[in-house]
Amino acid sequence: MRIYRISHFADLSGDGGRRASARWHHKGRPVVYCASNAAAAMLEAIAYIARGDPALLPSTFQLLEIELPDDVNREIVSLDWLPADWKQNLAHTRSLGDNWLQLQATAVLVVPSALAPDTTHFLLNPAHPELLPPGQGKIHIVRVEQYPFDSRLFEGQVRKP
């Protein structure tokens, strides 16, 4: 199966997770966030990185298409397991993700999207044996597209000076 990621770098190191907390982990933990389709990956970038402002989308962004073989072990987080307020309850989702990263039981954690109903995201644990060595494990990048955002997404918005 193919999964997608928006990133400055064409790698799966998880370095961004070391630098900043996100919905499913606390800062300091290497993790790679991916989406089930390119549109969902782009939506996440617009919502979280640019906060809806095209001026904040770096021109260095690229869309990574990643091969995730069916035989890679994964854990699936069902909506039934999450509290009703999971989208606002970052303490809960971050704790869940941190525990998954620490246990290293699977290489992939499949989670629901908070932005797009019926969409899933894939968290990759770059420290898991199935992903090692980085870039040479079972999961790998198959295509890179430079700055995939269409200018029509931001028509009519005023860019900040």
Feature locations, PLM:
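Extended catalytic/binding region for NAD+/ADP-ribose chemistry, centered on the ART fold
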Residues: 27-48, 122-130
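Active-site and NAD+-binding cores of ADP-ribose-processing enzymes
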Residues: 2-17, 25, 52-161
